[in-house]
């Protein structure tokens, strides 16, 4: 279901990170898909988004040991606060990585923002803002994080929305729900 499938999906994102950090593969993936740090940052942002959905839905979840099945075949459940703190830190790291990246080669592979790194930064900061506002209900000290996220730039209009646009008829991602079930 929802819980298991999201961890499977995040393993794909973790593979992107591994391929872009492994000395044996990182040059190849940079030449194919653009700056390594940019790819890592985008994967971390999407992972943060999915982890946030999971912890908001289930509360305590595997986070710190998740996605490392070799070393942690039964990962511990982290508290929601620990997950939120970890996600905020990862989103800040991703923002810094994007600010120091180039878009060369990424434009065609970016199905969310077409290679626009400024929109990825806004998305990361908007996720930080959402995490901080939700956590501030339990701990008002998170309001400082919310203010920092706003100052760093967040989504302000529908032009900034993160969405996957399906391709036209006959292309690989045409109607994936229909194609997956019929």
Question: What spans do the regions from the language model cover?
Answer:
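Conserved, well-structured interaction surfaces
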Residues: 1-64, 68-105
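Secretory-pathway/luminal and periplasmic proteins that interact with or process carbohydrate-rich
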Residues: 50-60, 138-140, 152-160
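Solvent-exposed loop/turn segments at secondary-structure junctions
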Residues: 70-71, 136-138, 161-162
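Aromatic-lined, polymer-binding surfaces characteristic
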Residues: 80, 84, 114-124
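Short, glycine/acidic-rich hinge or "gate" loops at secondary-structure transitions
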Residues: 104-108, 142-145
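Asp-box/WD-like beta-propeller blade repeats and closely related beta-sheet repeat scaffolds
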Residues: 108, 112-114
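Hydrophobic-face positions in mid-chain alpha helices that act as interaction patches
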Residues: 141-182
């Amino acid at each position: 279901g929802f819980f298991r499938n999201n961890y499977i999906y995040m393993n794909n994102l973790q593979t992107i990170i591994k391929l872009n950090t492994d000395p044996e593969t990182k040059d190849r993936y940079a030449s194919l898909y653009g700056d390594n740090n940019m790819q890592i940052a985008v994967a971390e942002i999407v992972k943060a988004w999915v982890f946030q959905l999971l912890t908001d839905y289930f509360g305590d979840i595997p986070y710190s040991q998740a996605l490392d099945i070799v070393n942690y075949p039964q990962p511990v459940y982290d508290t929601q606060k620990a997950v939120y703190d970890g996600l905020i830190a990862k989103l800040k790291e991703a923002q810094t990585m994007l600010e120091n990246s180039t878009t060369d080669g990424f434009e065609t592979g970016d199905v969310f923002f077409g290679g626009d790194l400024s929109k990825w930064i806004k998305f990361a900061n908007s996720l930080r803002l959402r995490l901080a506002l939700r956590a501030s209900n339990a701990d008002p000290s998170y309001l400082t994080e919310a203010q920092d996220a706003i100052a760093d730039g967040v989504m302000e209009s529908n032009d900034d929305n993160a969405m996957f646009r399906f391709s036209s008829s006959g292309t690989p991602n045409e109607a994936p729900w229909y194609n997956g079930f019929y």
